[in-house]
Amino acid sequence: MLRWLRAFVLPTAACHDAEPPTRYETLFRALDRNGDGVVDIGELQQGLQSLGIPLGQDAEEKIFTTGDVNKDGKLDFEEFMKYLKDHEKKMKLAFKSLDKNNDGKIEPSEIVQSLQMLGLHISEKQAELILQSIDSDGTMTVDWNEWRDYFLFNPVTDIEEIIRFWKHSTGIDIGDSLTIPDEFTEDEKKSGQWWRQLLAGGVAGAVSRTSTAPLDRLKVMMQVHGSKSMNIFGGFRQMVKEGGIRSLWRGNGTNVIKIAPETAVKFWAYEQYKKLLTEEGQKLGTFERFISGSMAGATAQTFIYPMEVLKTRLAVAKTGQYSGIYGCAKKILKHEGFGAFYKGYIPNLLGIIPYAGIDLAVYELLKSYWLDNFAKDSVNPGVMVLLSCGALSSTCGQLASYPLALVRTRMQAQATVEGAPQLSMVGLFQRIVSKEGVSGLYRGITPNFMKVLPAVGISYVVYENMKQTLGVAQK
């Protein structure tokens, strides 16, 4: 179909200047299915699909947002032609940024080099597969005509936006606080898109955590009490019997409230650490991103850690033990002192490294596997691939850091367990292994894994809807 597009609409011997209006008019007429002189979004969707022209996610909406100058919900010919001319200019700049040797063609080695500068590392073979999806004449290089035809109606405007197909962020929240922060481009920062995306992610996280709160509380109860006899159904039955259905959400308020300060501190710290680790104008590589993200996570955890302790104390509390978040904080301060708000802080910090490291490593592995085996028809992996990769890599990160998370939770709550000795991190590890075996370090991991799929689905749906509500430009 791309060959058809070039032959029918865009001449093969086209110069690098904008196409003559008559060529745009031919394409416009092909899209104007009812012949009324304007193209609405339905006609654009149907027309482009029938022509086999590749589209990015929500491409039609973005084309209309940019091209519909008079905001009447339709594109007339002048708006249509102006959009294509402006878009081709931007795609020309993207093409030149990839064409390192200025020979008018993009080769696999240039793809590898450009992506490395953006912190995305792929092999020459993977670059060839990407080029195959764009290369229409089988030369294993992409010239300007092929590049323009492929991205003609894909509203990406620069190479960074193209690469963000594989940005390790999909707005999912599985309830953990150790993930590396999102990456935002300079354009997103200047336009204010960054805070809208963070807000959308925060709302998605709040809804997701609230929806899966019963499983999260069950996990905490199993971590703290460590009884082999407490299974999932027995745990739920015990919680409902003790405090009713509402008790299943005990501690969720704190878990939701801490999203805002944690996200804000993590984002600010991440930007500062990136500046420290990279020179001005230098792109952030995977290793620098890992270090910056880990340090930002540690900074955010230091700031909001008292809320982590409050969440655990409220989750394991009996009905009427605390009057609320403030009452819980007041009791802890009165009876245990300020230091109690940082119990379990060390294992929590230590857990950041294996979590963030394995999360990134598994994501890169899954990305490479997809590029090697499935990247034949499009450079865009699609929503389901990104969600699956993100969820699986986060789950692997959780699995690696879970023993530290369990010890952290027990240290936070051990003052509330009658007859329990106040042990250090090492002492707790030794006690758990000696009394419960190595499997004791993974107590509660089943409900933790059970909440991953619903958390991913709920947070993604809410995130996408919130982005639309807040006017975040779709990629």
From Swiss-Prot:
Membrane-spanning ranges: 198-215, 251-270, 294-307, 344-363, 387-404, 444-463
Residues covered by the EF-hand domain: 19-54, 55-88, 86-121, 122-157
Keywords, comma-separated and alphabetical: Acetylation, Antiport, Calcium, Membrane, Metal-binding, Mitochondrion, Mitochondrion inner membrane, Repeat, Transmembrane, Transmembrane helix, Transport
Positions annotated to bind Ca(2+) 3: 99, 101, 103, 105, 110
Claim: 4Fe-4S is one of the keywords in the record: no
Modified residues (N6-succinyllysine): 318, 435
Protein name (database record): Mitochondrial adenyl nucleotide antiporter SLC25A24
Annotated source species: Mus musculus
Gene from which this protein is expressed: Slc25a24
